[in-house]
Amino acid sequence: YQDLLRVSVASPGNDHRLGANEAPPAIISMFLGDELTELLNSIASGQHHDNAERVKMTVGADIIPFIRKDNTDRNRTSPFTGNKFEFRMLGSASSISDTNVMLNTMVADTFAVFADRLETAGDTEAEVKNIIKETVKAHKRIIFNGDGYDESWVKEAEKRGLYNLKTTPDALAGRAAAA
């Protein structure tokens, strides 16, 4: 649905803003943080996940308590960040209503597929694991825990088959070509 999400925020002003200093790039990605990414990769590979302790930072002063290392997107370069939903592709002057309709439709469509599978499953718990495994394998290319402003991300995203629809005409043509 990456092309539809981009179309949902298409405007001349947003074309100028996306990928600039104050906004994420026009590439749809999801920042999960290392901890959650490792958990999902473990499920997808069928391996046991070692729930390691959170990393603590050392700040070099004895009087300051240990500070847990933040595993969220500190640069806020991803439309979906950490343990919260923060859709940043939309410009501040725009209404999020169209984008919400599209997002909710995408989620509902996906949940309907999951529900159909679970309703007919003999072993629901095993089917949940299968759904997670298949979903992670099919969509892990959108997970990016790095700096979305770095030029290397644009090249990596292209290798992963992610769109970088920088302009409204690109977004509309990308959707038309995919339809």
What are these regions, as identified by a protein language model?
Residues 1-179:
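Acidic, glycine-enriched catalytic cores built around paired aspartates
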